[in-house]
Amino acid sequence: MSVPVSSKKENDMPQIYQLPLGALGTNCYIIPGEDSRAVVIDPASAAEVEMFLNTHGLKLGTIIVTHGHYDHFAGAAQLMESTGASLLASAPDEAMYSSAAKCWADFMPVEFRPIKPDKLFLDGEEFTAEGLKFRVMGAPGHTAGSCLLFTEIGG
């Protein structure tokens, strides 16, 4: 079940949807952007993300991974293959994206699929994805590359 984190504004700007996904109920966020293309943050399950996108008439444009634990990117490889979406991920955790042992995949009941980000980002960087501007704030502790993402919806 998805939960809208923000309600639609009067000018019909997009919502931010929160979906608890995968074996651990990891929070995934889906933000509709320009041209019905969505940004998906921390996709723990490709099948559930694809079902949500299809139900809401959205196409996947960009995947963002906030840190290197597998429960936050378990669905990313499949989504990249099936949609051609680009992948952005936190740079300090780069080694975790290709190692089952480093990203704790051994503790999950799904097959490990490594990812290769198209772009790695660092604390303080800004980027645009599907017409949405994001600012990265490093939040090391959970992992060295854990980060927060800030965006303004509708202004």
What name fits each language-model region?
Residues 3-12:
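Short, Lys/Arg-enriched N-terminal segments with co-localized hydrophobic residues
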Residues 45-128:
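Active-site HxH/HxHxD metal-binding segment of metal-dependent hydrolases
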Residues 38, 46, 103-106, 110, ...:
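Metallo-beta-lactamase
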Residues 22-24, 112-114, 118-120, 140-144:
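Short solvent-exposed loop/turn micro-motifs enriched in small/polar/acidic residues
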